[in-house]
Design a protein with these regions (language model features):
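N- or domain-start disorder-to-order transition segments that initiate the globular core
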Residues: 1-27
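Charge-rich, well-structured scaffold segments of protease-associated domains
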Residues: 10, 64-216, 231, 241, ...
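His/Glu-based metal-binding/catalytic segments typifying zinc-dependent metallopeptidases
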Residues: 21-25, 30-32, 214-273
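Solvent-exposed coil/turn segments that connect beta secondary-structure elements
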Residues: 22, 34-36, 59-60, 94, ...
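Short pre-active-site segment immediately N-terminal to the catalytic Zn-binding motif
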Residues: 35-44
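Active-site SXXK
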Residues: 46-59
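Phosphate-proximal small/polar/acidic motifs at interfaces that engage nucleotide phosphates
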Residues: 276-277
Length: 421
């Protein structure tokens, strides 16, 4: 069913424009570009993220300072991020200034020039960013997990890229990657606020004038998840683990995805939920424990991350498997209703944010998914039964004695060893 508040228009050159008319005092406008880690060769690894930094560093008519001042003098904000499957450049402004937001995005997406001095400056910034994440225990744990769970797949690598790549990227590398992926048919402009769709489309059409360029899309390997056990030592003082297994994908049905969300909430929807109660409250095995889920176009995973003492790892891993498999049966009516209420509340909070709505619409348009109203989604949530949850649990979660998990463990470095792992 069509969401009456969301309108979609595909322009003649392939650019897609999505608007959601909603009663906010500000407007959020973003460009969703279908390129990220997954599109990069090994030699290009890190280019999507580097390019995300560079689009703010000068265009044919504006310097980096002029670009930021163009939005900030209006009280607005601009930012960007890179993920596995997309790069997003966005701005948020007061309602009356929405045309300035379109002008800004059109300029940085079409006219970035990548000055040499800015490349060198951002190269140093990204090197510091890499070092920062390498010194963050949770980031390093997640990176180690992805390296093993998706070994051999592009998504096993870091979005930031390796230092040797960052140190060698040239202006031509940035230009070539920019010209390859920042093309009309590969971009969605998504906006939310008090917006007239037709007026917005006409202004976007006039602002984005570049023609069609052929784009070669990367197809993700389906079900590239691997059941591997890996362990390494590191400089951090506390041990961690992530165990995970194949999860739902972005292309699965809305009902399956929502049932999966409810399942995840039953497991870890707060301090009274199963995972926290079993691992921390009942057994005291971990200071921090949480369910982790990640959904991609053709891949996904669900698992448990914990920070704990090394002596508790084996017991905590087994208990985590027990908790995960526990949702295959014996879900109480109270648990199910609590999860439904929690998921609905979270959904309601997103509908109170123009940035959340524009983001959801941008992703849905980029990957060809349907749009749903809040009421349609709420109706779906409360229609889900315990049997629906059991079916999804049995489809994705192995039995508690199964080895169908990727198990990754990080422990403090043993200083008695002569050499680090």
């Amino acid at each position: 069913m069509k969401n009456e508040n969301v309108n979609v228009t595909k322009l003649e050159d392939g650019l897609t424009v999505v608007t959601q008319n909603a009663d906010f005092n500000k407007v959020f406008i973003g460009a969703w570009i279908k390129t990220g880690l997954i599109n990069e060769s090994d030699e290009e690894n890190g280019l999507s993220h580097f390019l995300e930094h560079m689009v703010f560093k000068g265009t044919q008519t504006r310097s980096a300072l002029q670009l930021s001042d163009y939005i900030e003098k209006l009280g607005g904000e601009c930012n960007a991020y890179t993920s596995i499957e997309e790069t997003v450049v966005h701005t948020s402004l007061l309602q009356d200034y929405w045309k300035y937001g379109v002008d800004f995005l059109a300029d940085v997406i079409q006219n970035s020039v990548f000055p040499e001095e800015e490349i060198e400056r951002e190269r140093a910034v990204i090197m510091q960013e890499i070092a920062m994440y390498e010194n963050d225990p949770t980031s390093e744990m997640f990176r180690f997990y992805m390296e093993n769970a998706y070994k051999g797949d592009p998504i096993s690598r870091s979005i930031l890229g390796p230092q040797e790549n960052i140190s060698s990227f040239t202006q031509d590398d940035l230009r070539n990657y920019f010209n390859k992926w920042y093309t009309p048919e590969n971009i969605v402009i998504s906006a939310c606020g008090n917006i007239n769709h037709d007026e917005f489309v006409d202004y976007v059409r006039a602002s984005f004038k570049k023609g069609f360029r052929e784009t070669k899309f990367y197809t993700q390997k389906e079900n590239s998840f691997k059941n591997i056990k890996a362990k390494k030592q590191n400089i951090f003082s506390q041990s961690q683990f992530i165990i995970g297994t194949k999860g739902i994908t972005m292309m699965d049905s809305d009902k399956d995805k929502m049932t999966y969300t409810i399942l995840a909430n039953i497991l870890d929807g707060g301090m009274s939920c199963r995972l926290f109660q079993e691992i921390r409250e009942k057994h005291g095995l971990a200071y921090q424990v949480s369910l982790i889920t990640h959904t991609m176009v053709e891949n996904g995973f669900i698992g448990v991350h914990a920070s704990l003492e090394e002596r508790n790892i084996d017991k905590a891993i087994q208990l985590s498997k027990n908790v995960l498999s526990s949702v295959k049966e014996n879900i109480s009516d109270d648990e199910l209703m609590k999860a439904k209420n929690s998921v609905t509340y979270g959904l309601s909070s997103k509908h109170d944010s123009c940035s959340s709505l524009a983001t959801s619409n941008g992703i849905r348009a980029l990957f060809g998914l349907d749009f749903k109203t809040f009421e349609e989604t709420k109706e779906l949530i409360y229609s889900i039964t315990k049997d629906d949850v059991y079916n999804i649990a049995n489809k994705y979660i192995p039995n508690e004695d199964s080895d169908d998990y990727c198990v990754t463990i990080m422990t403090p470095w043993d200083k008695t060893n002569e050499e680090r792992n």
